[in-house]
């Protein structure tokens, strides 16, 4: 599976890592551990599907917050777009369920905005390819597939 990040995801993860005193400092490791421990078919076929089309799905994945030792249902929500036709997965957003930056759920308009932004960034070749085995290290700054 090839992993990419959108601008919204990079902004979300940056905001969370700056709030280390609020218990979010493990977010990068937790995302990498969650994605690295799942096989491609699981990432495509399971989890909470938010939207499903012929060529892609938008999925919500519960990610454990290892720093706060919370159960997955109280930790992070990772929103991603995954192709059903290729090995491409784009991280769209992440947010905590609890804490000062906690969000209960994203609205339909927010999901629509994330999808539109990702499609625009794909066309403009500004998605970043990352390595989930190396703490989301950027492999390619401006890429398209």
Question: PLM features: residue spans?
Answer:
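Acidic side chains
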Residues: 30, 40-44, 48, 99, ...
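Residue-level signal for secondary-structure boundary elements
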Residues: 21, 39-43, 123-127
């Amino acid at each position: 599976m090839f992993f990419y990040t959108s601008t919204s995801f990079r902004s979300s993860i940056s905001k969370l890592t700056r709030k280390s005193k609020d218990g979010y400092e493990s977010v990068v490791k937790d995302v990498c551990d969650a994605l690295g421990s799942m096989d491609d078919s699981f990432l495509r076929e399971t989890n909470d599907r938010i939207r499903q089309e012929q060529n892609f799905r938008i999925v919500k994945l519960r990610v454990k917050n290892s720093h706060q030792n919370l159960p997955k249902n109280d930790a992070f929500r990772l929103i991603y777009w995954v192709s059903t036709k290729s090995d491409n997965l784009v991280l769209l957003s992440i947010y905590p369920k609890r804490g000062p930056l906690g969000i209960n759920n994203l609205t339909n308009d927010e999901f629509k905005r994330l999808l539109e932004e990702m499609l625009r960034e794909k066309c403009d070749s500004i998605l970043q390819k990352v390595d989930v085995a190396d703490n989301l290290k950027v492999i390619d700054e401006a890429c398209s597939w």
